[in-house]
Curated annotation (Swiss-Prot):
Record-level GO BP terms: xylan catabolic process
Pathway membership: Glycan degradation; xylan degradation
Gene3D superfamilies from the UniProt entry: 2.60.120.180
Species of origin: Aspergillus fumigatus (strain ATCC MYA-4609 / CBS 101355 / FGSC A1100 / Af293) (Neosartorya fumigata)
Principal location listed in the UniProt entry: secreted
Recorded effect of pH on activity: Optimum pH is 6.0. Stable in the pH range from 4.0 to 8.0.
Catalysis performed (reactions): Endohydrolysis of (1->4)-beta-D-xylosidic linkages in xylans
Alphabetic keyword roster: Carbohydrate metabolism, Glycoprotein, Glycosidase, Hydrolase, Polysaccharide degradation, Secreted, Signal, Xylan degradation
SUPFAM superfamilies, alphabetized: Concanavalin A-like lectins/glucanases
Active site residues of this protein: E124, E215
Temperature sensitivity of activity: Optimum temperature is 60 degrees Celsius. Around 53 percent activity is retained at 70 degrees Celsius. Stable from 30 to 60 degrees Celsius with maximum stability at 30 degrees Celsius.
This protein's GO CC annotations: extracellular region
Protein name as annotated: Endo-1,4-beta-xylanase xynf11a
Molecular function GO labels: endo-1,4-beta-xylanase activity
Organism lineage string: Eukaryota, Fungi, Dikarya, Ascomycota, Pezizomycotina
Amino acid sequence: MVSFSYLLLACSAIGALAAPVEPETTSFNETALHEFAERAGTPSSTGWNNGYYYSFWTDGGGDVTYTNGAGGSYSVNWRNVGNFVGGKGWNPGSARTINYGGSFNPSGNGYLAVYGWTTNPLIEYYVVESYGTYNPGSGGTFRGTVNTDGGTYNIYTAVRYNAPSIEGTKTFTQYWSVRTSKRTGGTVTMANHFNAWSRLGMNLGTHNYQIVATEGYQSSGSASITVY
């Protein structure tokens, strides 16, 4: 995921550099209408809603609609998306105990996870509670396991090169805890994951935001989640 402010700055710079020497006129034809429809949905944004921090980011592909609800609730529906991540939680993150519940129905690749970032070092982390057709741990390096909250989580690390982050395009490490028995509600004791990661030399930095997120990648689906 990437910060919304960085995207706005990048888009402004791209627009300035790409301005044509001579003005062009285009008609709003069927092709333009089709392209607009493919990119329909909720724009990227962050902020506070009903006492919870929310973050929603999309690469603009496909159709994804994110809606904040009462309290810690949100819903998201997506169809043929590129990539998006959205949810509600806190800013800054911490080793808190999180309770959540709801529904998560991906058709294809998607994750339901506690998701957050730290800086110094720049770390993107996931505690995955459920996923669709792709186990995100399969692309990483297995580091160990942690037993907590009635289940076993496999721990992985991965490196993202020149990828979007909360600090712009950077190379950074991802930390993953992936639950072996999927669920869509319960308690997540973040202190247990952070301590397990630390014992494996996987250190975190200064916490940025931390949300219970739904992520979709080249897929369709729906989710309705409440954070307590």
